[in-house]
Amino acid sequence: MSKRIDEIPDVEIDGTGKFKYIQIKVKDKDSGDTKLIVRGYGRCGYHNDILDEVKTQYKGFSFTCPGGGRIDHHEGNKTLFVYGFSQAYGQPDHSKAVELLKQKYPNYNITYSNEGY
């Protein structure tokens, strides 16, 4: 994988709260390398707002969204619950988000459900 794409963090989510999240497939336009990242921000009212924000942060990459949902994050209890879907992008494979979240939050109890909105 290219050094450039490795500089993009795999996971960036807000602290305690419920918020929308998306999975983003990032592709380095020069090398063709790809990777999946997770972003979730309470400040974004729509899933596409998250994608728009990420697009402005990194140049030389293309971004596609395989889907989104919501995350319920409790820092005090060290729990993350990934669930639901995005009306704009559909429902992703939440297990892929959980894999990435477990790398960033190894001491957390992280679960997911395909139910809910």
Language-model features: locations:
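Intrinsic low-complexity, intrinsically disordered or marginally ordered coil/linker segments
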Residues: 1-117
